[in-house]
Amino acid sequence: FPINLKQFGNASIFCITLTCITYVLTYGKVLDWYDDPTIQWATVGAVVAGILFVYIEVTQRNPYYQFDVLKLRTIRFGFLFYFLLMVLNSSSMFVNVFTGIGMKLDNYQNATLGNWSMLGYFIGGIATIWLSVKGVHFKYLFAAGFLFLGLSAMFMYFEVQGAGLYERMKYPVIIRSTGMMFLYSLIPTFATQRMPYKYLSSWICTMLTVRMVLAPSIGTALYSNVLQERQQHYITRYAQNVDMMHPEASASFMQTVQGMQYQGKSKQEAVNMAATSTKGRIQVQATLSAVKEMAGWTLYACLFCMIFVVVLPYPKRKLLT
């Protein structure tokens, strides 16, 4: 068993560190970052627990986590590749945001789209096995994975519009899942090449920490915060030109007011509902513009990662014992 009772305390301290970091990343924007005392305490807890964990592991004879595992270049590469993958994989929110805001779909229909990821995983798994048997170098397989992630973002860039089709939203899900499977399955294979068995538990800890905790938390916080900021930017930008002097906005506003009055609403209620309707249309358009912009930047990031993993040196290393 990779952990005994004596090492359980070390693992608990490590989990406290990750919990505090995740709390700060998840609720920082909601709680206005360090103006909230809980964010301050969580940061202090993460720093103190992290330092305590490192101290215990360095001074203990049989540590839970062996820091020597980070001396292996393939492990460091695996750490980096997993981080890039899971951060960019947070772009999966584009489909949910677009279908929820632009198409007004419910959670069940959004969840149904997610089922198409199984097809992408199947395609990616078969392609990975076939290309590996053919002897294709790891760097080209990694590049293919990031390429598929970029193609998914590019599809969303051109597809995001006011008249998008629900049936077409399965394609970015399939493409993204295919690319994710390339990287998800090959990174541990590459990272553990000729790795001494004594580092197995440390590698598993590193892999799960990056893949399941740190990178998804950072990616989700990054994409959600940037989406909110760009959404507010476009709302301010579009609202500047929407007034009674604008022909289309004025006609739509007056039509809504008249429609509400025909339904028995008072003039004030009709005006308020027309203003709410106008605000809603601006918000939808701003959200779609923000998603399109972020999809474009995600495409650039994927292309950068694709080039990066190709030009990165993959030297042979000796077996460490």
Feature locations, PLM:
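Hydrophobic transmembrane-helix bundles of small-molecule transporters
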Residues: 1-80
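Alpha-helical transmembrane segments of polytopic membrane proteins
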Residues: 7-14, 35-46, 108-120, 172-180, ...
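Hydrophobic alpha-helical interface/terminus motif in multipass membrane transporters
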Residues: 24, 57, 99-100, 191
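Small-residue (Gly/Pro/Ala) motifs that create kinks and tight helix-helix packing interfaces
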Residues: 25-26, 96, 128, 218-223, ...
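Transmembrane-helix signature of multi-pass solute transporters
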Residues: 48-49, 148-158, 304-311
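Transmembrane core module of solute transporters
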Residues: 62-186
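Small-residue-rich alpha-helical segments with characteristic i,i+4
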Residues: 169-249
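Hydrophobic transmembrane architecture of multi-pass small-molecule transporters
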Residues: 213-314, 320
